[in-house]
């Protein structure tokens, strides 16, 4: 997934899959129907911050969860619902199934994937790991169940830095996959000995440092918020770097009234909800037209529509299955992450 021509083919495929816009009346009907189905089926809707605002609002209204991938995993595992509907991309649905194999996990579409997942096929990644058996394998959550099963640790962007620091303190050297930009950022912050896989997010790698500097000149009082999946030159311009949840917290706590945000624009829903008196501006990508492969919104996240949420509930379609042999292997590094972050939470709160 590194050639522009390949990106354009992917984008054309995804554009063809998008539904027509709904009228306000149609949207209200879908939301009511989905809420009724969730209640009838003892189901819960979990949505990522990058989903369209209407999906995030629906998850909140129906007692579900809107969060980053770490909290999505934790919420789905701990919730009493028999069915979890995951509005996000496929690896998120797989993670939910791995953590709670006894539950039914549905997704609005199984075609919503991730360029990081696609760019890290298990055969090639396993061969890379086999060449360095002395290294601890740490993989980003944006990977397939098979890649997770090959790993020692799974991390999200909200906990990756702390986990790598802990491993480094233990004298461990690391294989990191698949996001090269996040890996390089962690390497720079910690000084850890890391071999990096060559993957990238099609949204975040589109942010451009020169255009970002030009935009900062237009908004001199703005703070720049950057997700660490962005290129290093973009990260270097940031006032705050972090995961989606960390960027939302930065928007709440920094005194600035204007923010230039270098991550998927789906996050603006929660930022504007929590900070109604502040202004949020999209960081510039490659530009308009064919050269812009994402334009600050993941095309796969955009495939999570109201129509597809209702269809998957009514038809029981798009159920996530994970190969049974992979589950015990993949759940170990996932539980390590959850246990680590829970212990860190307790330590911060003074309970450990």
From Swiss-Prot:
InterPro entries: NadA, NadA_sf, Quinolinate_synth_A_type1. This is Quinolinate synthase. Transmembrane segments: none annotated. The keyword 4Fe-4S applies. Keywords: 4Fe-4S, Cytoplasm, Iron, Iron-sulfur, Metal-binding, Pyridine nucleotide biosynthesis, Transferase. One of its GO terms (biological process) is 'de novo' NAD biosynthetic process from L-aspartate. It catalyses: iminosuccinate + dihydroxyacetone phosphate = quinolinate + phosphate + 2 H2O + H(+). One of its GO terms (molecular function) is 4 iron, 4 sulfur cluster binding. [4Fe-4S] cluster binds at residues 114, 201, 298. It is found in: Cytoplasm. Pathway: Cofactor biosynthesis; NAD(+) biosynthesis; quinolinate from iminoaspartate: step 1/1. Belongs to the quinolinate synthase family. Type 1 subfamily. Its cofactor is [4Fe-4S] cluster. Iminosuccinate binds at residues 48, 69, 140-142, 157, 227-229, 244. Its EC number is 2.5.1.72. One of its GO terms (cellular component) is cytosol. Binds 1 [4Fe-4S] cluster per subunit. It holds the Pfam family NadA. Catalyzes the condensation of iminoaspartate with dihydroxyacetone phosphate to form quinolinate.
